[in-house]
UniProtKB/Swiss-Prot annotation:
Keywords, sorted A to Z: Cell membrane, Membrane, Olfaction, Receptor, Sensory transduction, Transducer, Transmembrane, Transmembrane helix
Subunit structure: Interacts with Orco. Complexes exist early in the endomembrane system in olfactory sensory neurons (OSNs), coupling these complexes to the conserved ciliary trafficking pathway.
Entry's transmembrane regions: 40-60, 74-94, 136-156, 201-221, 277-297, 302-322, 370-390
This protein's record includes keyword Cell cycle: no
Organism of derivation: Drosophila melanogaster
Similarity comment: Belongs to the insect chemoreceptor superfamily. Heteromeric odorant receptor channel (TC 1.A.69) family. Or1a subfamily.
Keyword Hydrolase applies: no
Protein's membrane topology: Multi-pass membrane protein
Annotated GO biological process: detection of chemical stimulus involved in sensory perception of smell; signal transduction
Cytoplasmic face of the membrane: 1-39, 95-135, 222-276, 323-369
Subcellular location per the Swiss-Prot or TrEMBL entry: Cell membrane
Protein name: Odorant receptor 45b
Designated gene of the protein: Or45b
Record topology, Extracellular segments: 61-73, 157-200, 298-301, 391-396
Length: 396
């Protein structure tokens, strides 16, 4: 038995921003719907839970920084991811109405393409939709496995020390008030700490899924524009005045839709620039500290950080892949126009084609401070983390 969204019979319309809606829905944040008091209270609890556990991780790491740097690193590594996720959760709630409006506009634009009854568009749409949902849920699943790995580590350590004096340790390296590390409150705070790991997973999977989904949905709309350019500029020998006029109108519609896509991407950049920048910076540090922890630890402790590193790397890869896919499809508009039979049309049509080619030379990208997410940026991030690890090895 596997999840319904993996089935080929699952309605295509439900795939649109599925990961974002599902992940944030688990936290009580609903986009485009009226927020009930129950959902709002659940959202506030999750936010406070994550903030409180971030503070507990920081206290643990700071208190062990001089006496046990290895344990301090074990606390600071998840803390970087948790604190970033806390920022993302607050940011997405603050911009929730803009996010909902953006989702509705994309739904309308894609709905216009669905009315075309074009097999090429249907195949491309299904391909992009399934990729967004499956890759987003892959990160969601990997994050849950990471939380499970930390919990299993904690339970295993309890089992190994069962004949010794019992240590009331949390699944993550957290230091609460003294009563939380004693019975009868210990089981409650143990679950409280574990849940903060899942809040982290749901929030970062929802935010990352929103970015990845948006870029691939835009890539689909740009691909649909490419099909329209190819259809509008089909080779016709001696086109009539009426045919030239129709072609010019179709090209004008293509330009308008291209402008609309660029406008939406600009608005999206305004919403996601801050969380994306913070994510890339923190992900670089998290990957580096995870690799350092792998070098410092031995035995079963390595497994959880291998999974953790793979999860964070997968999330940042989706950002970069989505940005590259969108910019590539944007550049392909100019290639499609140039490869068409534009030379057989009249002067006005050729002029419009020339303008499309010039416009397409400037790719559409999500603007983030200092960079635009792309596969070369992913390579740079990995190199940067490698430099941090090399520096840490010389110090440690």
């Amino acid at each position: 038995m596997y999840p319904r969204f993996l089935s080929r019979n699952y309605p295509l319309a439900k795939h649109l921003f599925f990961v974002t809606r599902y992940s944030f829905g688990l936290l009580g944040l609903r986009f485009g719907k009226e927020q009930s008091w129950l959902h709002l209270l659940w959202l506030v609890f999750n936010f406070v839970n994550l903030a409180h556990c971030c503070q507990a991780e920081f206290v643990f790491g700071w208190s062990h920084l001089r006496t046990s740097p290895v344990d301090a690193m074990d606390a600071f590594c998840p803390l970087a991811c948790s604190f970033t996720t806390l920022f993302k959760l607050g940011w997405m709630w603050w911009r929730r109405q803009e996010v909902a409006d953006l989702m509705d506009r994309i739904r309308l634009l894609i709905g216009e393409q669905e009315k075309r009854e074009d097999s090429r568009r249907k195949v491309a749409q299904r391909s992009y939709y399934l990729m967004v949902t499956r890759c987003g849920m892959l990160v969601f699943t990997l994050g849950s496995i990471t939380t499970g790995a930390f919990v299993l580590r904690s339970l295993w350590e309890m089992w190994v020390r069962r004949h010794q004096e019992f240590k009331f340790d949390m699944p993550f390296r957290m230091l609460f008030h003294d009563f939380a590390h004693r019975m009868p409150w210990f089981p409650v705070f143990y679950l409280y700490s574990t849940w903060s790991g899942q809040v982290t997973v749901y929030a970062f999977a929802g935010t990352d899924g929103f970015f990845f989904g948006f870029t691939l949905y835009m890539a689909f709309l740009l691909q649909a524009l490419r099909y329209d350019i190819q259809d509008a500029l089909k080779p016709i020998r001696d086109p009539s005045l009426r045919e030239s006029k129709i072609c010019c109108q179709r090209l004008a519609d293509i330009v308008d839709r291209h402008n609309e896509i660029e406008k939406i991407v600009k608005e999206f950049s305004g919403i996601m620039a801050a969380p994306t920048f913070v994510h890339f910076v923190s992900a670089s540090l998290v990957i580096a500290t995870s690799v350092i922890d792998i070098l410092l630890y031995s035995g079963y402790n390595i497994i959880r950080y291998v999974v953790y590193t793979f999860t964070v790397s997968s999330a940042i890869f989706l950002y970069c892949y989505g940005g590259t896919e969108m910019s590539t499809e944007s550049l392909s508009l100019g290639e499609a126009a140039y490869s068409s039979a534009w030379y057989t049309w009249d002067r006005e049509t050729r002029r419009r084609v020339f303008l499309i080619i010039l416009r397409a030379q400037r790719p559409i990208t999500v603007r983030v401070p200092f960079f635009a997410p792309s596969l070369p940026v992913f390579t740079s991030v990995i190199k940067f983390t490698g430099s941090i690890v090399a520096l840490a090895k010389t110090i440690l």
